[in-house]
Each structure stands twice: as C-alpha cells, then as structure tokens.
From Swiss-Prot:
<feature type="binding site">
    <location>
        <position position="157"/>
    </location>
    <ligand>
        <name>Ca(2+) 1</name>
    </ligand>
</feature>
<dbReference type="GO" id="GO:0006338">
    <property type="term" value="P:chromatin remodeling"/>
</dbReference>
<dbReference type="GO" id="GO:0005634">
    <property type="term" value="C:nucleus"/>
</dbReference>
<feature type="binding site">
    <location>
        <position position="349"/>
    </location>
    <ligand>
        <name>Ca(2+) 4</name>
    </ligand>
</feature>
<dbReference type="GO" id="GO:0140795">
    <property type="term" value="F:histone H3R2 arginine deiminase activity"/>
</dbReference>
<dbReference type="GO" id="GO:0005737">
    <property type="term" value="C:cytoplasm"/>
</dbReference>
<feature type="binding site">
    <location>
        <position position="170"/>
    </location>
    <ligand>
        <name>Ca(2+) 3</name>
    </ligand>
</feature>
<dbReference type="Pfam" id="PF03068">
    <property type="entry name" value="PAD"/>
</dbReference>
<dbReference type="InterPro" id="IPR013733">
    <property type="entry name" value="Prot_Arg_deaminase_cen_dom"/>
</dbReference>
<feature type="binding site">
    <location>
        <position position="168"/>
    </location>
    <ligand>
        <name>Ca(2+) 3</name>
    </ligand>
</feature>
<keyword id="KW-0804">Transcription</keyword>
<feature type="modified residue" description="Citrulline">
    <location>
        <position position="218"/>
    </location>
</feature>
<keyword id="KW-0378">Hydrolase</keyword>
<keyword id="KW-0539">Nucleus</keyword>
<dbReference type="GO" id="GO:0005829">
    <property type="term" value="C:cytosol"/>
</dbReference>
<feature type="binding site">
    <location>
        <position position="155"/>
    </location>
    <ligand>
        <name>Ca(2+) 2</name>
    </ligand>
</feature>
<keyword id="KW-0164">Citrullination</keyword>
Amino acid sequence: MAQGTLIRVTPEQPTHAVCVLGTLTQLDICSSAPEDCTSFSINASPGVVVDIAHGPPAKKKSTGSSTWPLDPGVEVTLTMKVASGSTGDQKVQISYYGPKTPPVKALLYLTGVEISLCADITRTGKVKPTRAVKDQRTWTWGPCGQGAILLVNCDRDNLESSAMDCEDDEVLDSEDLQDMSLMTLSTKTPKDFFTNHTLVLHVARSEMDKVRVFQATRGKLSSKCSVVLGPKWPSHYLMVPGGKHNMDFYVEALAFPDTDFPGLITLTISLLDTSNLELPEAVVFQDSVVFRVAPWIMTPNTQPPQEVYACSIFENEDFLKSVTTLAMKAKCKLTICPEEENMDDQWMQDEMEIGYIQAPHKTLPVVFDSPRNRGLKEFPIKRVMGPDFGYVTRGPQTGGISGLDSFGNLEVSPPVTVRGKEYPLGRILFGDSCYPSNDSRQMHQALQDFLSAQQVQAPVKLYSDWLSVGHVDEFLSFVPAPDRKGFRLLLASPRSCYKLFQEQQNEGHGEALLFEGIKKKKQQKIKNILSNKTLREHNSFVERCIDWNRELLKRELGLAESDIIDIPQLFKLKEFSKAEAFFPNMVNMLVLGKHLGIPKPFGPVINGRCCLEEKVCSLLEPLGLQCTFINDFFTYHIRHGEVHCGTNVRRKPFSFKWWNMVP
C-alpha cells in the first residue's frame, strides 16, 4: 500500500485533511496531546479504518472502545474505504484521558479522494486499475515481473514527412497513437475539491528529453491530443473537474537505452494543497508509474524470414533472378533497391540490420542504420522507415569509422543456455581486434555501447580484424536444425577444405580444376593447391584465427563440437597481411528458413559435380535444408563480398517476450 502524508491533530481546533484511497496515512496523536493525559481512545466514521500498533490496550471501556497508552511508541494509521461525497464528511475523534483531568477531545475531518495513475504494469496490453494492489514505482524483469513499457515512436506514419514521429509535438492519426502507451488518471472527489487543490503531472528534468506525453482532451481522437510533457515541458498543471473523472494520456519514448540512459522513465502525478494563497503549494500525495523503454532486438537466421532486400547493379541480373527464386520458395516479400538509388553500392547487409521493438500492445520492426554512409546511406531512411517501420542509428555520421562498423560485422546467435544462464533471445556477435594497436580496427564505441545497453542480447566480442574486410559473416553463420539446440553453427574451415582436396587427390583427381568455367580467372589444379606452401601457411594462420573464435563461441554460447559444422573454405593473405576468401566464401550464405542461398564456389568438378558443393550438401541436407548455389563471382566475390553481404532479411520477431527474461 502506498504511503500517505502525516496528519497532526490538536485539541485546540478541528483538523481538516485529505486521505487518498489506497494509501496508509500516519496520524500524530502525541505531539499536541494535553500535558496531563496518559492515554487515548479513537472513534471514527464507518468509512475510515483505524489501525493502532502497540501492545495490549491499557483499559477496556464500558462502551466497547479501548484506550491505549499515550507514548511515542504507539503508531496510529488511517485508511479510507470509499471516496467522500462532500468535503470533510468523514470524522475521527481522539479522546485524551488523564488521572485527574476530564477527557479532552480532538477532531479530525477527513476528505477521502481517489487519485490513481494507471498504466499497463501487468503487461497484458490493457490498462487496469492497480490501486492498493501493485507498486507501480518499481520495474522488474521476469515472468512474474511488473512494470509498464514504452516504445520509441521511431516510425514515420506521415509519408510526406522526412522525420520520425517522435521528432514532432503532434499526433498524426490513430496509427500514431497505437505506437504509444496508454496511461490513465482516475479521480473521484467531492465536486468542489479542486477549488482548493490541483494536480500536476511531471517528469524529472534528467528524463524530460527521453519522453513525450500527450493528453487526450476530447475522447480519444488523435486530432484532440495536445502535448503536456516533453523536452520543453517537465511539468503540467491539469484542469480536472470534481466528481468521478478519467483522463487519458499517450506516452512515447524519444530515445533508446544507451550508455547514458538506462531506459527507465518515471511519470508522477502530485496532488497539491492550494487553499492558502499566501503560502506555497503543499504536497499532499504523489503517485508514480515507471516505464522501461523497449530495447532494440535482433533476429537470428533461425527466425522465419518475411522480407528480403537486395540491390540492382550493373550486370547482376542473374544474381537477382536467383535471389528472387529463393525468396519465392521461402514465401518472402522481395524489395530491390534500384541502381539510381544505391549508387553502385550493392552491400545491403553492411548498410543496415533489421530488428524490432515490442510492447504488450504493439510490435514494430526497426531498421538499425550503420554509420558507413556510402551509396546506400539514404535507403534505410527513405525506403525502409515508414508507417509501422522504425529507424535508429548510432555512431559518427562523417568520418571516424572503420570497416568493422558495417553490419556484416553484426550477427546474433539463436537462443542459447550457457552454464545454466538462459539467453532466450540469443547473443549479439560482432568482430573486433584481439588487442588495441596503431593498426588495429574495432567497432565504434558508440555502436558497442548501444548494443550492450539493450540488455536482452548480451554481446560477445569476436576476433575478426585478421580479415581484410573484417566482418564476422566471413567465417560464421547459423542455420536451423530439427534436433539438439535447434540450430548449427557453421564455421569456415581451411582444414576441412584441405582434407577434402587430399581425399580427391588420393582417389586420382589431382588434375581436377578450381575455377573451371570462370573467364579470365586462372584455373588451379587440386594437386597444385595442395603443394602450394605459401597458401598452406596462409591458411594455417587463418585456421588459428578461426579456432580462437571457435573456442570463444563454444564457451560464450554453450556449444559442443557436435553443434558446429565445418564448411570447407580456403583463404589468402593480401594487403597488410589480411585474409580474404580464395574462392567464393560458402559460409557467407543467405538463410531463408530451410532454403539456403550459398555462393557458388566453382570447385573442382569430379564425376560431373563440384566436389565442394557436394560436400556442403552432404553436411546440410540431412538437417532438412535445401542448398541453392548462386553465382556471385564477378558482381560480389571479386569485390570482396558474397551472397550474405549483398542481401538483407527482415525476420519474424521472437514469440518470447523480452520482459519475461532476466538479463
């Protein structure tokens, strides 16, 4: 039960006070008691509940009431059963007794009022009265937790605008309202109560730039909503009529959790006594609701695909046909960014990552725009953000970034359990250097801080700076599986590739050619690849780098060797001794449910079939997966990327609700 104010009574004159339903009000009967009195009794109107905490009563009176010793150890508290119909209609009488004095009486006239600020703290999608049931001032995680949730209103319902909805002080329409959380103020008072009292809605100055509150002034029409709290207004006096009244507010978050903002916002209603115009307003009662801003959540390859994105560039028609066919098989929507918009920047994966935000009443996809800002820089803002599709970005928009700030370097695992700790939404994975140096690269700290601040997908930092491009999607991927943990981790493996080529040579296929059928590309025999000492040394180094990540992933994702599949792949060291794929990197695949779009490796053809494709199919098809090998050699591979780099996927949000986890 909420704590009310302290009421002091005196025999000299009647005391008038307000008691809010659902609060426990302390009654001071000692400080003004007559000097010669040693005990007291209390009688109250039927609408008042009096509780006295002490030892046994001093004496039982003939009328049935009891007396208690008058000492500071006695605690007297009041609660109200019902709201008053008129001012001061509930009475409490305190009678003081002394051994040589007649009884002395003190009168207290109470006005019971109902004032309740309600939000969806039970996370059911509906606002329910919570007076005297739950403490709305705390926010707790877990299936038994409580606390209201806010969405950052980061979509753009007005197609004529270039800004997010949260960047203005207006409510566009009912769709805009649905992106906000409802909060209701319920009051029940005597008709004349607000002649001498007023209500103020307020937010801490440290949080005022993180939230905006609109008041529905006429019903629930969006056109009749006016802003009352926000970056310019930390408080607002409310015009509330007496009697029984409900007032609706719509609340939107303006910022995601980040290193300087834990994501919690407290809105408070204060009841002020304004009866004496010569004195400052006095606080009678406060009620607060704590909201948590919904985090941005990534979706792993194991989530069902809903929409595929790719770019149209010069001479990639065949690539797009293959992606289109794959999307149709997976029953996905396909969005193509035309050449005139992408400015010959085909790296759709690097430009953005599509996740979502969720409250009990609304789920919203949100595109996270990387700070790379190349040819595709306008695509997330102009073509992805829109009605019910949000937008967020972090990091410097000009300069100060590296290749590791592109989102091919940002992945997320499927749900895992690690040493008894559950990660029901998986864990974020991004690449970094193994130690800082003048030559090392790392993901920008602003991006790292943002990802960590979301709390629900605790990030794991991998080692990817050994790669020329430096992205984690160059050596790992996840695919769904029907058994074990529900997925497999795929890792690029030079060791597996050398083993396969050695087996083929042992069977008499040493003359078989890599890159056969690729124009203007030097073909290489299996036997020459196996005897190339420099290439062996390069891949020995790469294997050690991948093995480092292998052990890190096993430890941080709780994986066993049986959860990992090695995909045969060779690398070569180029400028600055950084690695890049020797042939199209098959682990850099597009995963659409059971349909996989894998870079065509152009491996040695043996008995009419590419031995690399055959090996990969033998590893993945037993899991119920269908492998489609896509030719990306000239349009993507030679430009240091593959199928995954050139595509992006919006996936179905988790059925698991993020607020039910414990970070």
